[in-house]
Amino acid sequence: MHTPLQTPATDAPRPHAASTPRRGGAKPPRPYASPLRQPTAIPALDQRPVADAGAIFRAIPAFPGPAASSLYIHIPFCFHKCHYCDFYSIVDTRDRQEPFLDRLIGELAAIAPWGASGPLRTIFVGGGTPSLLRPELWKRLLAALAERYDLSEIASGRGEFTVECNPETVSPGLMDILRAGGVNRVSVGAQSFEARHLKTLERWHDPENVARAVALARAAGIERQSVDLIFGIPGQTAAEWERDLRIALSIGTGHMSCYDLTYEPNTAMTARLRRGEFTPAPEDLEVEMFDTTVRTLRAAGLERYEVSNFARPGAECRHNLVYWRGGSWLAAGPSASGHVGGHRWKNTPRLDDYLSRGTGGFSPVVDHEGPDRRRDLVERIMTALRLAEGLDAAEILRDAALVEPAAAVRLRRAALKGVGEGLIGADLSRWRLTDAGFLLADGVALELMTALDPV
């Protein structure tokens, strides 16, 4: 269907392999480049299994760090590959859902001990199109989660359990099954309410079914819903984008994710662009759309809590906040990435390998990084700076000094530079981006991260 940081078709910023955030990781062409046109920075992996996840997990207890209280599950099946999507997904013509679920349940059992110190507080099921999984298989998956994990926080309503949904695959029966299994939040991929723009994106759903999907979720007792939109679609006007926002608001969801269209490598959308089939939206139009988003949603009571995410008070995506605040999470399914005890890993993104090459219930892994203080600090700056709450200056400077005493001095100097340029707020106890800074978030983060490099 569609962590951290990207143009997805969902509100979940799914972490990628090791340390690389999805958007804004590459060096921009100027000191404060707009995040609207940042290339994706992903390590060049051959995508073949290189490690046994069991060995990685067995090493984790040797390092300090909180146990994971969050879980990401990736379900790769789609009925059609959207042209802008670079997430691992397959159009399954061989009906591999059942063997996949058998394998997934085994993996969930294998990794459970690393989250067993307490209840799970958040679960996010992404894809792919999770709502395409057959209802009887959803029942099995939800039962397996309840058997292997403590879901008391989620059952009480204090925790969060999100499932991504395509509007065309939402049914009353499926929503009832999800709610009975503890799901209390759905993320509906609308992308646009204009049929011609959906056609450009190769999204196969009727725009009117977005409101229907949200209504069915509510009727089943799933109290929280999020709607995802994309702007900067070729041919899209500022007026059309504002109309999309107002239609989404009329549906009454408490959370919206609004992403600019990014031309990711190895996608059909990028291939079409290179063939000259369309012209990308001008950056000044994208900036106008970005400003319209903030203004329109703020007036409706949805505040920006992250560069591309807006919510009414208390409706923020708690699972996303785990990523952005540098927390720990378990991960299961092909291409899923996890972070526990300073270790980061990415499961194989090939379903055939996922089904056939795991050992002891664990998935084969294509990338792994062990604990690294400097890398962790860089990631915290990149992700936390995108939050409206910003960074605790004293904490980040203390940790920078542990990496290298002079690094803290350089980092503070870089932050003061951002303050002087009006990109970071004047409150020096927390480094928060201003409205102008949010437009240039990746560039500001790069300035701070570069300050950590040895001179």
Model-based region annotation:
Residues 74-89:
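Local cysteine-cluster metal-coordination motifs and their immediate loop/turn environment
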Residues 403-419:
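Short amphipathic alpha-helical interaction segments
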Residues 390, 412-413, 425-426:
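Structured DNA-binding interfaces in DNA transaction proteins
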Residues 436-455:
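Short, amphipathic alpha-helical interaction segments positioned at domain boundaries
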